[in-house]
Swiss-Prot record:
Chain residues that bind Na(+): G77, T80
InterPro entries documented for this protein: FluC
UniProt topology in membrane: Multi-pass membrane protein
Keywords: Cell membrane, Ion channel, Ion transport, Membrane, Metal-binding, Sodium, Transmembrane, Transmembrane helix, Transport
Regulation acting on activity, per entry: Na(+) is not transported, but it plays an essential structural role and its presence is essential for fluoride channel function.
GO BP term, example: cellular detoxification of fluoride
Transmembrane segments: 9-29, 34-54, 67-87, 99-119
UniProt lineage: Bacteria, Bacillati, Bacillota, Bacilli, Lactobacillales
The reaction(s) this protein catalyses: fluoride(in) = fluoride(out)
Stated name of the protein: Fluoride-specific ion channel FluC 2
Localisation per UniProt entry: Cell membrane
A GO cellular component entry from the record: plasma membrane
Family as reported in the entry's similarity comment: Belongs to the fluoride channel Fluc/FEX (TC 1.A.43) family.
């Protein structure tokens, strides 16, 4: 068997681990109806992991493609969550927390882009 045939399994297992980490972080951070700190934190953590992983891969090309796929697509994909971002956005909108909504979207999208840009330019 070719090792490429095992890539989906590695992605699947790593995504389960990423989802578990996301869940554990959400139980660790105090829940607040005013602001979804847990979602923001795991998305920032996912950005950090993905940028670190990609930069590391580009610097050290000896890393296995399967490992990169498992960690990038699997773990980081399971850790970060666009659907929770949207759900939290709708919850803030429905409850009339407009200032929190604007801040959340600015921090999530703008902050995420700035974090990715900063980490991408940083010399490790």
């Amino acid at each position: 068997m070719k090792k490429e045939q095992f890539y989906p399994l590695g992605i699947f297992l790593a995504a389960m681990l990423g989802g578990l980490v996301r869940y554990l972080v959400s139980t660790w951070l105090p829940a607040s109806p005013d602001f979804p700190w847990g979602t923001l934190f795991v998305n920032y953590l996912g950005i950090f992991c993905l940028i670190y992983l990609v930069k590391g891969y580009l610097v050290y090309k000896g890393t296995s493609k399967g490992l990169i796929l498992a960690l990038g697509t699997g773990f980081c994909g399971g850790l970060t969550t666009f659907s929770s971002l949207m759900l939290d956005t709708v919850k803030l909108l429905d409850t009339g927390r407009y200032l929190s909504l604007i801040l959340y979207l600015l921090l999530s999208i703008g902050g995420g882009l700035l974090l990715a840009y900063y980490l991408g330019r940083k010399k490790w």
